[in-house]
């Protein structure tokens, strides 16, 4: 997300606000296409994931760089938004399993959770790498270790597959974007 957004901002010269608006419109169109699918189509799904990653990154970057919202605050806000999404999703649907995303409301909750995961990953990754001074390599290794811990907890049956998936996803998105954004 970070790499794609930076390319549009700097190479195309669009700037952060215009890039954010353009990519948000593209995301809405791609999600519209995704919601119209009657089965899993990898190219549509992964295009949606890619666009959600770009827009999630742009949301955080816009809040921090354009509006001056501090990274610690954006990290907390996106963490709370993600937790609230999970709570409402579970309260309405009774599951957070990716294997039970078989209705439009569940798919909507899924994509909202993924969007907040990318926004949170950008905020937390930048907070650790830049603001806390850990650098990109150390932050990447730390989040990578988080994935290993989640995998071990799942393997030892300490956490279930749903918790494991979402925890690993959050750490994966943070780990993936850090080296690519440097």
Language-model region placement:
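C-terminal ends of transmembrane helices
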Residues: 28-43, 85-102, 150-162
């Amino acid at each position: 997300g970070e790499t794609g957004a930076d390319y549009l901002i700097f190479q195309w010269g669009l700037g952060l606000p215009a890039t954010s608006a353009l990519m948000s419109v593209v995301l809405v169109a791609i999600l519209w296409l995704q919601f119209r699918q009657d089965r899993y189509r990898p190219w549509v799904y992964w295009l949606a994931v890619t666009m959600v990653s770009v827009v999630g990154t742009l949301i955080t970057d816009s809040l921090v760089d354009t509006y001056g919202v501090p990274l610690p605050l954006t990290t907390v806000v996106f963490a709370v938004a993600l937790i609230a999404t999970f709570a409402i999703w579970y309260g309405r649907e009774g599951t957070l399993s990716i294997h039970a995303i078989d209705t439009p409301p569940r798919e909507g909750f899924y994509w909202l959770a993924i969007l907040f995961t990318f926004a949170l990953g950008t905020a937390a990754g930048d907070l650790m790498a830049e603001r806390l001074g850990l650098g990109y390599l150390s932050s990447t290794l730390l989040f990578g270790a988080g994935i290993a811990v989640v995998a071990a907890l799942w393997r030892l049956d300490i956490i279930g597959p749903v918790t494991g998936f979402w925890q690993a996803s959050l750490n994966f998105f943070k780990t993936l974007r850090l080296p690519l954004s440097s």
